[in-house]
Every structure is written in C-alpha cells, then in structure tokens.
C-alpha cells in the first residue's frame, strides 16, 4: 500500500469488499493479524470461491504458525483460481513442509515438483524441494535439488560439488539394491 496504516483505516472505513480487503492487508502489514483474519473471513463468507481472498488468509495463518489453516485456505485458492501459477504450488509446498511430518513432506514434494514443472528456474522452489527431500531422508535427491539451485544462482562450483555428491549417493544406493 502507498498510504500509511492510519490513512488506510481512515479512507477505507466501511464494510464493503474493497474496504474490508484494504484494511485486512494494511492490518496484516502492521502485524494486527486478528483484524486481518476477521476481515478476510467476512470476505470469504461472501465470496467463498475467490482465490485471492483464500490465498491471503492462508498467508496470514502461515505467518501465525497455524499451518493447518494455512494449507486449508491455500488449497481453496488453488482449487478456485482459473490458472494456477508456479508460485501457488511453491507456497503450498512451503506450507506443507513446515508440518515436519513425513506424509506432509511427501505432499510438499509433489507441490514443489508441480511448481518446478511450470517454472524450472525458480531457485527458491529448488531450495524448498531440497529441504523437503532432506526431511524425508532422501539426501541424494536433496543434494541434486541443491545443485540445481546453485546452478540457477550462478554458483557453478557449488552446483558441481552437490551434483557429484548426489551422483555418488545414487550410485551407492543402487549398489545396495543389487546385494
């Protein structure tokens, strides 16, 4: 927003949709998440299929470490948006990864892969994917994802090191299968 918080509150002071949304965002930036959540829930009750309302409410819940609510509303955003972009899947992967549960990490990996299928040059999605793989114990895949990330940000030497490490780990795992 281009206005200070007090101006936003003064200008957008009714209960119409624009005012509720403006004050929800302004309060979110001010750290007044309770007011933001109240406004967003009112908007979602009026417009349950609006993906942008669901996305913002999910983001607010995530900022408050309420990962269950964050994923619920973000999933609603994904299901209601006309065309999902890579960032929606990346955010969902991030939300799921924070649960620190293997089944949620597996879901996170699926969402992050969807994100990377749309935009393989998103270095942060590769970073999140490496973290999710590590959380599930798939260290070779975590190292591969890290190599991709370093390649994208121009760290060729680190990229090569992680690619070699991933390759060696994959070879070791394959040799264990043949025993």
Question: Where do the model's predicted regions map?
Answer:
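Short helix/loop segments within enzyme catalytic domains
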Residues: 117, 121-124, 138-139, 152-158, ...
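Extracytoplasmic and endomembrane cell-envelope/extracellular-matrix remodeling and assembly machinery
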Residues: 1-83, 110, 141, 155, ...
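Acidic, polar-rich low-complexity tracts and alpha-helical solenoid repeat scaffolds
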Residues: 8-10, 131-134, 140, 144, ...
